């Protein structure tokens, strides 16, 4: 089964997402606070007043950034998981999950698996099958000095080269090495 991941609007059925509009308003307020801070820096006030205004605006901006992080991370990271069968047809299972809670659930499942004796390779790659090596156990390398390339040949291929050569005794550019 293949899993397809789609990003969702966090407020389905609405033209404008409430969370994104809230973040936009917060950004506008943050920009206004920064402008006020810059204006107070330019006006002829004493250093103590400038320091107090700058500290207050920095605190407001830090609070705004924290609110943006809370709203943005918890409400905008919604995804939809849908399973595809072998023919590429969607199954009816559609689950909307929060990415953070999904990651926390995976960590809990991994901790449960650590207590059990599980083959690590099968746990990480359950769909892989063991394959037999395709290279022959006994093989020869043919090294071409002209092109500086090495070729892996079987005994049958070497016999065919010797039979099909015009002059098998005159092959100074090819060197055959046996490897076991």
Curated annotation (Swiss-Prot):
Entry's transmembrane regions: 16-36, 52-72
The record's subcellular location field reads:
Host membrane
Q: Which GO terms describe its cellular component?
A: host cell membrane; membrane
* Topological category with respect to the lipid bilayer: Multi-pass membrane protein
Keyword Membrane (UniProt): yes
Q: Taxonomically, which superkingdom?
A: Viruses
What residue ranges carry the coiled-coil annotation? Answer: none
Which keywords does the record carry? Answer: Host membrane, Membrane, Transmembrane, Transmembrane helix
Keyword Transmembrane in annotation: yes
NCBIfam families given for it? seadorna_VP11 (TIGR04230)
Query: Know the name of this protein?
Result: Non-structural protein 4
Q: Which gene encodes it?
A: Segment-11
């Amino acid at each position: 089964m293949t899993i397809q991941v789609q990003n969702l609007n966090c407020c389905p059925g609405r033209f404008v997402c409430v969370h994104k509009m809230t973040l936009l308003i917060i950004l506008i307020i943050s920009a206004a606070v920064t402008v006020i801070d810059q204006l107070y820096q330019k006006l002829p006030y004493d250093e103590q007043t400038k320091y107090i205004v700058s500290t207050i605006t920095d605190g407001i901006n830090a609070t705004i950034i924290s609110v943006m992080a809370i709203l943005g991370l918890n409400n905008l990271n919604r995804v939809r998981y849908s399973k595809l069968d072998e023919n590429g047809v969607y199954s009816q299972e559609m689950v909307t999950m929060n990415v953070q809670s999904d990651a926390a659930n995976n960590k809990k499942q991994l901790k449960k698996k650590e207590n059990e004796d599980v083959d690590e390779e099968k746990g990480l790659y359950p769909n892989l099958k063991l394959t037999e090596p395709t290279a022959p156990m006994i093989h020869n390398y043919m090294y071409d000095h002209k092109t500086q390339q090495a070729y892996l040949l079987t005994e049958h291929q070497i016999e065919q080269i010797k039979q099909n050569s015009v002059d098998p005794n005159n092959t100074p550019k090819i060197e055959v090495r046996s490897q076991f």
